[in-house]
Protein backbone atom coordinates (compact mmCIF):
# COMPACT_ATOMS: atom_id res chain seq x y z
CA UNK A 1 0.00 0.00 0.00
CA UNK A 2 1.26 3.48 -0.91
CA UNK A 3 2.70 5.45 1.98
CA UNK A 4 1.12 8.66 3.31
CA UNK A 5 3.55 11.40 4.36
CA UNK A 6 2.86 13.95 7.08
CA UNK A 7 4.12 17.47 6.39
CA UNK A 8 4.62 20.39 8.75
CA UNK A 9 4.82 23.31 6.31
CA UNK A 10 6.40 25.90 8.60
CA UNK A 11 7.15 29.61 8.33
CA UNK A 12 10.87 29.13 9.01
CA UNK A 13 11.44 25.38 8.62
CA UNK A 14 9.45 22.45 7.27
CA UNK A 15 9.52 18.77 8.19
CA UNK A 16 8.23 15.52 6.65
CA UNK A 17 7.42 12.26 8.40
CA UNK A 18 6.06 8.80 7.58
CA UNK A 19 4.29 6.08 9.57
CA UNK A 20 5.78 2.64 9.05
CA UNK A 21 6.30 -0.50 11.11
CA UNK A 22 4.10 0.79 13.89
CA UNK A 23 5.70 4.17 14.43
CA UNK A 24 5.94 7.64 12.93
CA UNK A 25 9.43 8.85 12.13
CA UNK A 26 10.97 11.94 10.57
CA UNK A 27 12.42 11.60 7.07
CA UNK A 28 15.81 13.34 6.73
CA UNK A 29 16.30 15.52 3.66
CA UNK A 30 18.98 14.86 1.04
CA UNK A 31 21.36 17.05 3.04
CA UNK A 32 20.90 14.70 6.02
CA UNK A 33 18.88 17.13 8.16
CA UNK A 34 15.51 16.50 9.78
CA UNK A 35 14.16 19.95 8.91
CA UNK A 36 14.37 21.97 5.71
CA UNK A 37 14.44 25.79 5.67
CA UNK A 38 11.22 27.13 4.10
CA UNK A 39 13.26 29.22 1.67
CA UNK A 40 13.02 29.39 -2.14
CA UNK A 41 15.48 31.29 -4.36
CA UNK A 42 15.65 32.11 -8.05
CA UNK A 43 19.10 32.54 -9.61
CA UNK A 44 20.16 34.66 -12.57
CA UNK A 45 20.69 31.43 -14.51
CA UNK A 46 17.03 30.51 -14.04
CA UNK A 47 17.63 27.84 -11.39
CA UNK A 48 15.20 27.38 -8.50
CA UNK A 49 16.88 26.58 -5.18
CA UNK A 50 15.00 25.24 -2.15
CA UNK A 51 16.03 24.73 1.47
CA UNK A 52 19.56 25.08 2.84
CA UNK A 53 21.11 25.91 -0.53
CA UNK A 54 18.60 28.75 -0.99
CA UNK A 55 19.17 30.07 2.51
CA UNK A 56 22.97 30.11 2.08
CA UNK A 57 22.86 32.50 -0.87
CA UNK A 58 20.19 34.83 0.59
CA UNK A 59 22.63 37.62 1.51
CA UNK A 60 23.92 37.99 -2.05
CA UNK A 61 20.50 37.52 -3.66
CA UNK A 62 17.98 39.19 -1.28
CA UNK A 63 15.36 40.30 -3.80
CA UNK A 64 15.05 36.85 -5.35
CA UNK A 65 15.13 34.82 -2.14
CA UNK A 66 11.70 34.12 -0.66
CA UNK A 67 11.30 33.24 3.02
CA UNK A 68 8.37 33.40 5.48
CA UNK A 69 5.95 32.97 2.56
CA UNK A 70 3.49 31.42 5.02
CA UNK A 71 2.91 34.89 6.49
CA UNK A 72 1.15 36.03 3.30
CA UNK A 73 -0.54 32.72 2.45
CA UNK A 74 -4.24 33.34 1.71
CA UNK A 75 -3.88 37.03 2.60
CA UNK A 76 -5.66 39.84 0.78
CA UNK A 77 -3.50 42.81 -0.25
CA UNK A 78 -5.60 45.32 1.70
CA UNK A 79 -5.26 43.52 5.04
CA UNK A 80 -3.17 45.16 7.75
CA UNK A 81 -0.89 42.14 8.11
CA UNK A 82 -0.20 42.20 4.37
CA UNK A 83 0.93 45.82 4.58
CA UNK A 84 3.25 45.02 7.50
CA UNK A 85 4.74 42.04 5.63
CA UNK A 86 5.28 44.17 2.54
CA UNK A 87 7.19 46.77 4.59
CA UNK A 88 9.38 44.11 6.23
CA UNK A 89 10.26 41.69 3.46
CA UNK A 90 13.17 42.44 1.08
CA UNK A 91 11.48 40.80 -1.91
CA UNK A 92 8.58 42.40 -3.81
CA UNK A 93 5.12 41.63 -2.40
CA UNK A 94 2.55 42.64 -5.03
CA UNK A 95 -1.19 42.52 -5.60
CA UNK A 96 -2.65 39.76 -7.77
CA UNK A 97 -6.42 39.87 -8.13
CA UNK A 98 -6.74 41.40 -4.68
CA UNK A 99 -4.52 38.80 -3.02
CA UNK A 100 -0.86 38.90 -2.00
CA UNK A 101 1.74 37.51 -4.40
CA UNK A 102 5.46 37.98 -5.01
CA UNK A 103 7.23 39.34 -8.09
CA UNK A 104 10.56 37.85 -9.13
CA UNK A 105 12.37 39.17 -12.21
CA UNK A 106 9.13 40.43 -13.72
CA UNK A 107 7.15 37.23 -13.08
CA UNK A 108 4.42 37.03 -10.43
CA UNK A 109 4.16 33.95 -8.20
CA UNK A 110 1.37 33.21 -5.72
CA UNK A 111 2.27 32.09 -2.18
CA UNK A 112 0.78 28.71 -3.15
CA UNK A 113 3.32 28.34 -5.98
CA UNK A 114 6.25 29.23 -3.73
CA UNK A 115 5.01 26.89 -0.99
CA UNK A 116 4.54 24.16 -3.61
CA UNK A 117 8.26 24.33 -4.40
CA UNK A 118 9.01 23.63 -0.72
CA UNK A 119 6.46 20.79 -0.69
CA UNK A 120 7.99 19.35 -3.88
CA UNK A 121 11.39 19.15 -2.23
CA UNK A 122 9.90 17.43 0.83
CA UNK A 123 8.06 15.02 -1.49
CA UNK A 124 11.26 14.25 -3.45
CA UNK A 125 13.24 13.73 -0.23
CA UNK A 126 10.54 11.34 1.02
CA UNK A 127 10.57 9.41 -2.26
CA UNK A 128 14.37 9.09 -2.16
CA UNK A 129 14.19 7.84 1.45
CA UNK A 130 11.30 5.41 0.92
CA UNK A 131 12.38 4.23 -2.53
CA UNK A 132 8.88 4.62 -3.93
CA UNK A 133 6.59 7.27 -5.41
CA UNK A 134 4.64 9.36 -2.89
CA UNK A 135 1.33 11.02 -3.70
CA UNK A 136 -0.83 11.12 -0.55
CA UNK A 137 -0.12 13.62 2.23
CA UNK A 138 -1.54 15.18 5.37
CA UNK A 139 -0.44 18.82 5.75
CA UNK A 140 -0.67 20.85 8.94
CA UNK A 141 -1.68 24.48 9.40
CA UNK A 142 -1.83 26.79 12.43
CA UNK A 143 -5.05 26.25 14.39
CA UNK A 144 -5.88 29.92 13.96
CA UNK A 145 -5.57 29.89 10.15
CA UNK A 146 -8.77 31.14 8.55
CA UNK A 147 -10.58 29.46 5.67
CA UNK A 148 -8.64 31.34 2.95
CA UNK A 149 -5.31 30.32 4.45
CA UNK A 150 -6.36 26.66 4.77
CA UNK A 151 -7.61 26.52 1.21
CA UNK A 152 -4.39 28.14 -0.07
CA UNK A 153 -2.34 25.50 1.79
CA UNK A 154 -4.33 22.70 0.20
CA UNK A 155 -3.84 24.30 -3.22
CA UNK A 156 -0.09 24.42 -2.64
CA UNK A 157 -0.16 20.68 -2.03
CA UNK A 158 -2.05 20.09 -5.23
CA UNK A 159 0.41 22.23 -7.24
CA UNK A 160 3.23 20.13 -5.75
CA UNK A 161 1.63 16.97 -7.14
CA UNK A 162 0.28 15.78 -3.81
CA UNK A 163 -3.13 14.36 -3.04
CA UNK A 164 -3.89 16.21 0.20
CA UNK A 165 -5.93 13.74 2.24
CA UNK A 166 -6.39 16.11 5.14
CA UNK A 167 -5.47 19.55 6.45
CA UNK A 168 -5.13 19.36 10.24
CA UNK A 169 -4.23 21.87 12.93
CA UNK A 170 -0.63 21.91 14.17
CA UNK A 171 -1.41 21.67 17.92
CA UNK A 172 -3.84 18.82 17.21
CA UNK A 173 -1.13 16.96 15.28
CA UNK A 174 1.28 17.52 18.18
CA UNK A 175 -1.29 16.18 20.64
CA UNK A 176 -1.85 13.15 18.41
CA UNK A 177 1.88 12.40 18.49
CA UNK A 178 2.07 13.02 22.24
CA UNK A 179 -1.18 11.42 23.41
CA UNK A 180 -1.71 8.39 21.18
CA UNK A 181 -0.34 5.95 23.74
CA UNK A 182 -2.17 7.47 26.72
CA UNK A 183 -4.69 5.04 28.19
CA UNK A 184 -6.27 7.33 30.76
CA UNK A 185 -8.05 10.49 29.70
CA UNK A 186 -6.13 13.64 30.53
CA UNK A 187 -6.47 17.27 29.59
CA UNK A 188 -3.40 18.83 28.00
CA UNK A 189 -2.53 22.26 26.68
CA UNK A 190 -0.38 22.58 23.57
CA UNK A 191 1.55 25.86 23.41
CA UNK A 192 2.76 26.18 19.83
CA UNK A 193 5.02 29.14 19.04
CA UNK A 194 6.68 28.82 15.66
CA UNK A 195 8.48 31.13 13.28
CA UNK A 196 5.45 33.09 12.18
CA UNK A 197 2.39 31.85 14.06
CA UNK A 198 1.18 31.18 17.59
CA UNK A 199 -1.50 28.70 18.69
CA UNK A 200 -2.71 27.49 22.04
CA UNK A 201 -5.06 24.53 22.18
CA UNK A 202 -6.64 22.65 25.07
CA UNK A 203 -7.34 19.00 24.29
CA UNK A 204 -8.49 15.84 25.99
CA UNK A 205 -6.43 12.78 25.06
CA UNK A 206 -6.64 9.17 26.08
CA UNK A 207 -8.02 5.80 25.01
CA UNK A 208 -7.22 6.60 21.35
CA UNK A 209 -9.33 9.77 21.33
CA UNK A 210 -7.94 13.26 20.78
CA UNK A 211 -10.64 15.88 21.28
CA UNK A 212 -10.07 19.62 20.96
CA UNK A 213 -11.88 21.53 23.71
CA UNK A 214 -10.84 25.08 22.75
CA UNK A 215 -8.29 26.81 20.57
CA UNK A 216 -6.98 30.32 19.98
CA UNK A 217 -3.94 32.15 18.75
CA UNK A 218 -2.45 34.71 16.44
CA UNK A 219 -1.55 33.82 12.85
CA UNK A 220 0.95 36.72 12.81
CA UNK A 221 3.03 36.21 15.95
CA UNK A 222 6.20 34.14 16.10
CA UNK A 223 9.97 33.98 16.09
CA UNK A 224 10.11 36.27 13.04
CA UNK A 225 8.71 39.03 15.24
CA UNK A 226 11.41 38.41 17.85
CA UNK A 227 14.01 38.71 15.07
CA UNK A 228 12.42 41.93 13.82
CA UNK A 229 12.76 43.56 17.24
CA UNK A 230 16.49 42.76 17.27
CA UNK A 231 16.79 44.12 13.71
CA UNK A 232 15.00 47.35 14.68
CA UNK A 233 17.35 47.78 17.65
CA UNK A 234 20.43 47.23 15.47
CA UNK A 235 19.16 49.62 12.78
CA UNK A 236 18.43 52.35 15.35
CA UNK A 237 21.78 51.92 17.12
CA UNK A 238 23.66 52.05 13.83
CA UNK A 239 21.70 55.07 12.60
CA UNK A 240 22.39 56.95 15.85
CA UNK A 241 26.11 56.25 15.51
CA UNK A 242 26.57 56.82 11.77
CA UNK A 243 23.45 58.55 10.44
CA UNK A 244 22.99 55.69 7.94
CA UNK A 245 19.64 53.87 7.67
CA UNK A 246 20.40 50.21 6.94
CA UNK A 247 16.74 49.47 6.13
CA UNK A 248 17.23 51.19 2.78
CA UNK A 249 19.90 48.63 1.83
CA UNK A 250 18.34 45.25 0.92
CA UNK A 251 21.62 43.34 1.16
CA UNK A 252 22.36 44.83 4.58
CA UNK A 253 18.79 44.01 5.66
CA UNK A 254 19.31 40.37 4.73
CA UNK A 255 22.54 40.23 6.75
CA UNK A 256 20.73 41.83 9.69
CA UNK A 257 17.98 39.20 9.51
CA UNK A 258 20.49 36.38 9.52
CA UNK A 259 22.43 37.94 12.41
CA UNK A 260 19.26 38.59 14.44
CA UNK A 261 18.09 34.99 14.03
CA UNK A 262 21.50 33.65 15.10
CA UNK A 263 21.64 36.02 18.09
CA UNK A 264 18.20 34.88 19.24
CA UNK A 265 19.27 31.24 19.04
CA UNK A 266 22.55 31.87 20.88
CA UNK A 267 20.75 33.69 23.71
CA UNK A 268 18.74 30.54 24.42
CA UNK A 269 21.89 29.06 25.96
CA UNK A 270 24.20 32.04 26.51
CA UNK A 271 23.77 35.16 28.63
CA UNK A 272 25.34 37.38 25.98
CA UNK A 273 26.14 37.29 22.28
CA UNK A 274 28.12 39.51 19.93
CA UNK A 275 26.64 40.58 16.62
CA UNK A 276 29.55 41.28 14.29
CA UNK A 277 28.82 42.43 10.73
CA UNK A 278 31.96 43.84 9.09
CA UNK A 279 31.56 45.99 5.97
CA UNK A 280 27.80 46.23 6.50
CA UNK A 281 27.75 49.39 4.37
CA UNK A 282 29.93 52.34 3.32
CA UNK A 283 29.78 56.11 2.90
CA UNK A 284 32.13 58.83 1.67
CA UNK A 285 34.44 58.24 4.64
CA UNK A 286 34.87 54.54 3.88
CA UNK A 287 33.45 51.14 4.93
CA UNK A 288 31.31 50.79 8.08
CA UNK A 289 31.19 47.85 10.47
CA UNK A 290 28.43 46.89 12.89
CA UNK A 291 29.57 45.33 16.16
CA UNK A 292 27.11 45.08 19.06
CA UNK A 293 26.76 42.99 22.18
CA UNK A 294 23.27 41.84 23.09
CA UNK A 295 22.52 40.40 26.52
CA UNK A 296 19.71 38.00 27.23
CA UNK A 297 18.15 40.54 29.60
CA UNK A 298 18.10 43.19 26.87
CA UNK A 299 16.54 40.73 24.41
CA UNK A 300 13.93 39.69 26.95
CA UNK A 301 13.05 43.33 27.50
CA UNK A 302 12.41 43.62 23.76
CA UNK A 303 10.09 40.63 23.51
CA UNK A 304 8.28 40.69 26.86
CA UNK A 305 5.09 42.30 25.50
CA UNK A 306 4.81 39.66 22.75
CA UNK A 307 5.31 36.84 25.25
CA UNK A 308 2.74 38.47 27.56
CA UNK A 309 0.27 38.41 24.66
CA UNK A 310 0.63 34.63 24.43
CA UNK A 311 -0.01 34.25 28.17
CA UNK A 312 -3.21 36.30 27.87
CA UNK A 313 -4.32 33.96 25.08
CA UNK A 314 -3.60 30.92 27.29
CA UNK A 315 -5.93 32.30 29.97
CA UNK A 316 -8.69 32.95 27.42
CA UNK A 317 -8.49 29.47 25.89
CA UNK A 318 -8.43 27.64 29.24
CA UNK A 319 -11.50 29.63 30.30
CA UNK A 320 -13.23 28.92 26.98
CA UNK A 321 -12.64 25.19 27.52
CA UNK A 322 -14.52 25.51 30.82
CA UNK A 323 -11.46 24.55 32.84
CA UNK A 324 -9.15 25.99 35.44
CA UNK A 325 -5.38 25.75 35.05
CA UNK A 326 -5.24 23.06 37.74
CA UNK A 327 -7.33 20.82 35.44
CA UNK A 328 -4.55 20.83 32.83
CA UNK A 329 -2.28 17.86 33.51
CA UNK A 330 0.44 18.58 30.95
CA UNK A 331 1.64 21.68 29.12
CA UNK A 332 3.30 20.51 25.89
CA UNK A 333 5.71 22.95 24.24
CA UNK A 334 5.80 22.91 20.43
CA UNK A 335 7.57 25.08 17.84
CA UNK A 336 11.15 26.31 17.62
CA UNK A 337 10.45 29.60 19.39
CA UNK A 338 9.55 27.76 22.61
CA UNK A 339 13.31 27.34 23.11
CA UNK A 340 13.51 31.01 24.14
CA UNK A 341 14.06 30.93 27.95
CA UNK A 342 11.62 33.80 28.67
CA UNK A 343 8.85 31.92 26.85
CA UNK A 344 9.45 28.83 28.99
CA UNK A 345 9.67 30.86 32.20
CA UNK A 346 6.42 32.75 31.59
CA UNK A 347 4.42 29.66 30.58
CA UNK A 348 5.79 27.76 33.58
CA UNK A 349 4.88 30.69 35.84
CA UNK A 350 1.36 30.82 34.37
CA UNK A 351 0.70 27.18 35.30
CA UNK A 352 2.94 26.79 38.33
CA UNK A 353 4.25 23.46 37.04
CA UNK A 354 7.06 21.98 35.00
CA UNK A 355 6.57 22.03 31.24
CA UNK A 356 6.50 18.90 29.12
CA UNK A 357 9.44 19.15 26.75
CA UNK A 358 9.59 15.45 25.94
CA UNK A 359 8.67 16.06 22.30
CA UNK A 360 11.04 17.59 19.75
CA UNK A 361 9.43 21.00 19.08
CA UNK A 362 10.60 21.05 15.44
CA UNK A 363 9.46 17.52 14.56
CA UNK A 364 6.41 16.58 16.63
CA UNK A 365 3.87 18.27 14.33
CA UNK A 366 5.05 16.34 11.26
CA UNK A 367 5.08 13.14 13.31
CA UNK A 368 1.45 13.73 14.30
CA UNK A 369 0.51 14.48 10.69
CA UNK A 370 1.94 11.11 9.60
CA UNK A 371 -0.09 9.38 12.32
CA UNK A 372 -3.24 11.07 11.02
CA UNK A 373 -2.33 9.85 7.52
CA UNK A 374 -2.04 6.31 8.86
CA UNK A 375 -5.44 6.68 10.56
CA UNK A 376 -7.04 7.76 7.26
CA UNK A 377 -5.42 4.84 5.42
CA UNK A 378 -6.48 2.39 8.12
CA UNK A 379 -2.96 1.51 9.26
CA UNK A 380 -3.77 2.85 12.73
CA UNK A 381 -7.10 1.59 14.06
CA UNK A 382 -9.68 3.06 16.43
CA UNK A 383 -8.19 6.54 16.69
CA UNK A 384 -10.74 9.34 16.77
CA UNK A 385 -9.62 12.92 16.13
CA UNK A 386 -12.18 15.58 17.02
CA UNK A 387 -11.04 19.03 15.91
CA UNK A 388 -12.89 22.35 16.03
CA UNK A 389 -13.34 25.44 13.90
CA UNK A 390 -11.22 28.27 15.36
CA UNK A 391 -13.50 31.17 14.37
CA UNK A 392 -17.24 31.70 13.94
CA UNK A 393 -18.74 31.67 10.44
CA UNK A 394 -21.79 33.51 9.21
CA UNK A 395 -23.29 35.91 6.69
CA UNK A 396 -23.99 39.63 6.46
CA UNK A 397 -27.63 40.52 7.16
CA UNK A 398 -29.70 43.71 7.25
CA UNK A 399 -27.87 46.69 8.76
CA UNK A 400 -24.41 45.24 8.10
CA UNK A 401 -24.73 42.80 11.00
CA UNK A 402 -22.87 39.48 11.02
CA UNK A 403 -25.29 36.65 11.75
CA UNK A 404 -23.38 33.58 12.95
CA UNK A 405 -24.36 30.20 11.54
CA UNK A 406 -21.50 28.09 12.95
CA UNK A 407 -20.08 29.21 16.29
CA UNK A 408 -16.38 29.21 17.14
CA UNK A 409 -15.29 25.96 18.81
CA UNK A 410 -17.80 23.73 16.97
CA UNK A 411 -16.48 20.20 16.34
CA UNK A 412 -15.80 19.50 12.66
CA UNK A 413 -16.91 18.17 10.22
CA UNK A 414 -20.22 19.98 10.66
CA UNK A 415 -23.21 21.09 8.59
CA UNK A 416 -25.68 23.76 9.76
CA UNK A 417 -28.39 25.80 8.08
CA UNK A 418 -30.56 28.81 8.80
CA UNK A 419 -33.49 30.36 6.92
CA UNK A 420 -33.46 34.03 5.90
CA UNK A 421 -35.75 36.24 3.83
CA UNK A 422 -35.68 39.32 1.60
CA UNK A 423 -35.26 42.88 2.91
CA UNK A 424 -37.35 44.59 0.20
CA UNK A 425 -40.62 43.99 -1.67
CA UNK A 426 -40.30 42.11 -4.98
CA UNK A 427 -36.61 41.45 -4.43
CA UNK A 428 -35.53 39.02 -7.18
CA UNK A 429 -31.98 38.30 -5.98
CA UNK A 430 -30.00 38.15 -2.74
CA UNK A 431 -26.26 38.46 -2.17
CA UNK A 432 -24.80 35.97 0.28
CA UNK A 433 -21.71 37.59 1.86
CA UNK A 434 -19.77 34.94 3.80
CA UNK A 435 -17.79 36.08 6.86
CA UNK A 436 -15.43 34.66 9.47
CA UNK A 437 -14.70 36.22 12.86
CA UNK A 438 -16.13 37.20 16.23
CA UNK A 439 -17.16 40.84 15.72
CA UNK A 440 -20.79 42.00 15.61
CA UNK A 441 -20.61 43.88 12.31
CA UNK A 442 -19.68 42.48 8.90
CA UNK A 443 -17.09 45.18 8.17
CA UNK A 444 -15.01 44.13 11.20
CA UNK A 445 -14.75 40.47 10.18
CA UNK A 446 -12.82 38.59 7.50
CA UNK A 447 -14.70 38.46 4.19
CA UNK A 448 -14.38 34.98 2.68
CA UNK A 449 -16.36 35.64 -0.49
CA UNK A 450 -19.84 36.31 -1.81
CA UNK A 451 -22.28 34.99 -4.41
CA UNK A 452 -25.76 35.80 -5.71
CA UNK A 453 -28.93 33.72 -5.62
CA UNK A 454 -31.14 34.98 -8.44
CA UNK A 455 -34.62 34.26 -9.82
CA UNK A 456 -36.54 34.69 -6.58
CA UNK A 457 -40.29 35.09 -7.42
CA UNK A 458 -41.82 38.52 -6.72
CA UNK A 459 -43.25 38.69 -3.21
CA UNK A 460 -43.55 41.12 -0.29
CA UNK A 461 -40.46 41.50 1.88
CA UNK A 462 -40.11 38.76 4.46
CA UNK A 463 -42.16 36.22 2.49
CA UNK A 464 -39.51 34.33 0.43
CA UNK A 465 -37.66 31.65 2.38
CA UNK A 466 -33.96 31.30 1.55
CA UNK A 467 -32.13 28.47 3.27
CA UNK A 468 -28.40 29.10 3.76
CA UNK A 469 -26.30 26.05 4.60
CA UNK A 470 -22.71 26.03 5.87
CA UNK A 471 -20.75 22.79 5.47
CA UNK A 472 -17.24 22.51 6.98
CA UNK A 473 -15.32 19.38 6.01
CA UNK A 474 -12.67 17.59 8.06
CA UNK A 475 -10.01 19.91 6.57
CA UNK A 476 -11.79 22.93 8.06
CA UNK A 477 -12.65 24.15 4.54
CA UNK A 478 -16.07 25.68 4.04
CA UNK A 479 -18.75 25.26 1.37
CA UNK A 480 -21.77 27.58 1.50
CA UNK A 481 -25.02 27.04 -0.37
CA UNK A 482 -28.25 29.05 -0.63
CA UNK A 483 -31.59 27.70 -1.84
CA UNK A 484 -34.94 29.36 -2.50
CA UNK A 485 -37.40 26.94 -0.88
CA UNK A 486 -40.23 27.97 -3.22
CA UNK A 487 -38.45 27.33 -6.53
CA UNK A 488 -35.69 24.98 -5.45
CA UNK A 489 -33.13 27.23 -7.16
CA UNK A 490 -29.74 26.91 -5.51
CA UNK A 491 -26.26 28.38 -5.68
CA UNK A 492 -23.10 27.47 -3.78
CA UNK A 493 -19.49 28.52 -3.30
CA UNK A 494 -16.51 26.64 -1.91
CA UNK A 495 -14.66 29.10 0.18
CA UNK A 496 -12.47 27.37 -0.10
CA UNK A 497 27.28 10.76 20.15
CA UNK A 498 28.59 12.65 17.58
CA UNK A 499 29.99 16.04 18.24
CA UNK A 500 32.15 15.76 15.14
CA UNK A 501 35.30 15.98 17.27
CA UNK A 502 38.11 13.43 17.56
CA UNK A 503 39.25 12.18 20.96
CA UNK A 504 42.50 14.20 20.67
CA UNK A 505 40.57 17.38 19.90
CA UNK A 506 38.32 16.81 22.91
CA UNK A 507 41.35 16.20 25.20
CA UNK A 508 43.04 19.37 23.92
CA UNK A 509 39.87 21.36 24.59
CA UNK A 510 39.70 20.04 28.16
CA UNK A 511 43.36 21.07 28.77
CA UNK A 512 42.77 24.46 27.15
CA UNK A 513 39.75 25.04 29.38
CA UNK A 514 41.82 24.26 32.48
CA UNK A 515 44.55 26.71 31.41
CA UNK A 516 42.05 29.51 30.86
CA UNK A 517 39.69 28.60 33.70
CA UNK A 518 40.35 31.74 35.76
CA UNK A 519 40.11 34.09 32.78
CA UNK A 520 36.92 32.39 31.63
CA UNK A 521 35.47 32.67 35.12
CA UNK A 522 36.12 36.43 35.24
CA UNK A 523 34.64 36.94 31.79
CA UNK A 524 31.57 34.93 32.74
CA UNK A 525 31.12 36.93 35.97
CA UNK A 526 31.35 40.18 33.99
CA UNK A 527 28.74 38.95 31.51
CA UNK A 528 26.38 37.91 34.33
CA UNK A 529 26.88 41.28 36.05
CA UNK A 530 26.17 43.08 32.77
CA UNK A 531 23.06 40.94 32.28
CA UNK A 532 21.73 41.77 35.76
CA UNK A 533 22.54 45.45 35.21
CA UNK A 534 20.63 45.48 31.91
CA UNK A 535 17.64 43.95 33.67
CA UNK A 536 17.82 46.56 36.45
CA UNK A 537 18.00 49.42 33.92
CA UNK A 538 14.96 48.08 32.09
CA UNK A 539 12.94 47.55 35.29
CA UNK A 540 13.86 50.96 36.73
CA UNK A 541 12.87 52.80 33.55
CA UNK A 542 9.63 50.83 33.41
CA UNK A 543 8.78 51.67 37.05
CA UNK A 544 9.63 55.36 36.55
CA UNK A 545 7.25 55.53 33.60
CA UNK A 546 4.47 53.74 35.49
CA UNK A 547 4.74 55.86 38.64
CA UNK A 548 5.18 59.18 36.81
CA UNK A 549 4.39 62.14 39.09
CA UNK A 550 4.24 59.92 42.19
CA UNK A 551 8.06 60.03 42.34
CA UNK A 552 9.23 63.31 43.98
CA UNK A 553 11.38 65.51 41.73
CA UNK A 554 14.48 65.21 43.94
CA UNK A 555 14.25 61.41 44.07
CA UNK A 556 13.64 61.24 40.32
CA UNK A 557 16.76 63.36 39.72
CA UNK A 558 18.90 61.07 41.92
CA UNK A 559 17.57 57.93 40.22
CA UNK A 560 18.13 59.34 36.73
CA UNK A 561 21.71 60.31 37.64
CA UNK A 562 22.45 56.80 38.94
CA UNK A 563 20.71 55.31 35.90
CA UNK A 564 22.85 57.35 33.49
CA UNK A 565 26.02 56.41 35.40
CA UNK A 566 25.20 52.72 35.02
CA UNK A 567 24.34 53.11 31.32
CA UNK A 568 27.68 54.84 30.69
CA UNK A 569 29.54 52.03 32.45
CA UNK A 570 27.69 49.42 30.37
CA UNK A 571 28.81 51.19 27.18
CA UNK A 572 32.38 50.25 28.11
CA UNK A 573 32.84 46.76 26.62
CA UNK A 574 35.78 46.12 28.99
CA UNK A 575 34.04 47.12 32.23
CA UNK A 576 34.78 44.63 35.01
CA UNK A 577 32.27 42.93 37.29
CA UNK A 578 33.39 45.16 40.16
CA UNK A 579 32.84 48.38 38.16
CA UNK A 580 29.38 47.29 37.05
CA UNK A 581 28.42 46.08 40.55
CA UNK A 582 29.37 49.45 42.07
CA UNK A 583 27.06 51.33 39.70
CA UNK A 584 24.29 48.74 40.20
CA UNK A 585 24.55 49.21 43.97
CA UNK A 586 24.28 52.99 43.57
CA UNK A 587 21.18 52.67 41.36
CA UNK A 588 19.61 50.13 43.73
CA UNK A 589 20.10 52.51 46.67
CA UNK A 590 18.59 55.44 44.75
CA UNK A 591 15.72 53.23 43.57
CA UNK A 592 14.51 52.44 47.09
CA UNK A 593 12.32 55.54 46.78
CA UNK A 594 10.62 53.88 43.81
CA UNK A 595 9.69 50.89 45.94
CA UNK A 596 8.21 53.21 48.56
CA UNK A 597 6.14 54.98 45.92
CA UNK A 598 5.01 51.63 44.52
CA UNK A 599 3.87 50.35 47.92
CA UNK A 600 2.07 53.63 48.59
CA UNK A 601 0.30 53.25 45.24
CA UNK A 602 -0.69 49.64 46.06
CA UNK A 603 -1.92 50.62 49.56
CA UNK A 604 -4.08 53.39 48.09
CA UNK A 605 -5.50 51.00 45.50
CA UNK A 606 -6.36 48.33 48.09
CA UNK A 607 -7.87 50.96 50.37
CA UNK A 608 -10.15 52.19 47.62
CA UNK A 609 -11.09 48.62 46.80
CA UNK A 610 -11.95 47.64 50.36
CA UNK A 611 -13.82 50.89 50.86
CA UNK A 612 -16.09 50.23 47.90
CA UNK A 613 -19.21 48.14 48.11
CA UNK A 614 -18.73 44.53 46.95
CA UNK A 615 -21.03 43.43 44.17
CA UNK A 616 -22.19 39.86 43.54
CA UNK A 617 -20.25 38.27 40.70
CA UNK A 618 -23.36 36.95 38.96
CA UNK A 619 -25.35 40.19 39.04
CA UNK A 620 -25.52 42.27 35.85
CA UNK A 621 -26.43 45.93 36.20
CA UNK A 622 -29.36 46.87 34.00
CA UNK A 623 -31.93 49.62 33.57
CA UNK A 624 -35.55 48.51 33.44
CA UNK A 625 -38.12 50.81 31.90
Swiss-Prot record:
PANTHER family: HEAT SHOCK PROTEIN 70KDA. Keywords: ATP-binding, Chaperone, Nucleotide-binding, Phosphoprotein, Stress response. GO terms for molecular function: ATP binding; ATP-dependent protein folding chaperone; unfolded protein binding. It comes from the Bacteria. InterPro entries: ATPase_NBD (IPR043129), Chaperone_DnaK (IPR012725), Heat_shock_70_CS (IPR018181), HSP70_C_sf (IPR029048), HSP70_peptide-bd_sf (IPR029047), Hsp_70_fam (IPR013126). Induction: By stress conditions e.g. heat shock. It holds the Pfam family HSP70. It comes from Campylobacter curvus (strain 525.92). The modification Phosphothreonine is found at residue 197. Belongs to the heat shock protein 70 family. The lineage of its organism: Bacteria, Pseudomonadati, Campylobacterota, Epsilonproteobacteria, Campylobacterales. SUPFAM superfamilies: Actin-like ATPase domain (SSF53067), Heat shock protein 70kD (HSP70), C-terminal subdomain (SSF100934), Heat shock protein 70kD (HSP70), peptide-binding domain (SSF100920). Residues 598-625 are annotated as: Disordered. Acts as a chaperone. This is Chaperone protein DnaK.
Amino acid sequence: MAKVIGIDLGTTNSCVSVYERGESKVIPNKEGKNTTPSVVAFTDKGEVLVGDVAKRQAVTNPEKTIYSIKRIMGLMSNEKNAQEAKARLPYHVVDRNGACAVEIAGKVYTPQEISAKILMKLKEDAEAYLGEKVVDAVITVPAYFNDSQRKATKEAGTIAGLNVLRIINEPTAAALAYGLDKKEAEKILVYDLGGGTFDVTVLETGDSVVEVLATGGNAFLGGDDFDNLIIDWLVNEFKNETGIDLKKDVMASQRLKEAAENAKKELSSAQETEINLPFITADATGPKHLVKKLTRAKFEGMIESLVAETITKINEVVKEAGLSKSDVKEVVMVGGSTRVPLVQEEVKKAFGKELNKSVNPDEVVAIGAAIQGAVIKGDVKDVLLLDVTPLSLGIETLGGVMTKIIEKGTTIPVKKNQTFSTAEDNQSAVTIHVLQGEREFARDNKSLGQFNLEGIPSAPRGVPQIEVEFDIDANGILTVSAKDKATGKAQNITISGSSGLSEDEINNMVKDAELHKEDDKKRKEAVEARNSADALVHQTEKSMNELGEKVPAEDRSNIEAALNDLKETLKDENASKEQIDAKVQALSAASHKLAEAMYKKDDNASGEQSGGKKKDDDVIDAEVE
